[in-house]
């Protein structure tokens, strides 16, 4: 279902990402075409696999260095993939920047449903701590919202089962 990427589409408002989901496109194929192009020399399966890693790498705040290591390319190539991704989905870059800016001011990030997580280390003078907190600040609204959606769905299913023919006595 790619729920986290769907949540990202909603939160970022990125028109291309939203359109891809509305059309029922495979988002990893769409990303592959955008970052590798039609004549990359890679087969579709390999392109899709790498594009999937790029899609999720950016959700989790990976850098060109870590992405390069994960997909077995040079750091320069990984940076080119990241740049191509943001060129194809510019609303995602805006979302990341806006989320970090708002979190630096408020000290918290939130899910769509209002669940909050403090991120006081965003303004830390310790670069490693600040970078780790930036990854948390960007990821939490996405992953947290996806988790909230799944938890609400489980509650709805449980209530429907309890109200159904088997009901509580069917346990």
Go through the PLM ranges and name each one:
Residues 1-171:
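Conserved catalytic core of nucleotide polymerization and phosphodiester-bond processing enzymes
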């Amino acid at each position: 279902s790619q729920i986290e990427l769907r949540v990202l589409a909603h939160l970022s408002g990125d028109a291309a990402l939203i359109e891809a989901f509305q059309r029922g496109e495979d988002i990893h194929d769409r990303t592959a075409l955008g970052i590798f192009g039609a004549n990359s020399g890679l087969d579709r399966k390999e392109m899709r696999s790498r594009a999937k890693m790029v899609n999720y790498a950016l959700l989790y705040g990976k850098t060109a260095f870590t992405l390069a290591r994960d997909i077995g390319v040079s750091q320069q190539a990984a940076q080119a993939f990241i740049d191509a991704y943001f060129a194809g989905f510019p609303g995602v870059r805006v979302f990341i920047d806006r989320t970090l800016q708002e979190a630096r001011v408020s000290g918290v990030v939130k899910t769509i449903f209002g669940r909050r997580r403090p991120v006081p280390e965003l303004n830390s003078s310790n670069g490693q701590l600040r970078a780790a907190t930036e990854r948390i600040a960007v990821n939490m609204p996405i992953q947290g919202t996806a988790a909230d959606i799944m938890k609400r769905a489980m509650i709805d299913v449980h209530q429907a089962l309890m109200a159904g023919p088997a009901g509580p006595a069917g346990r």
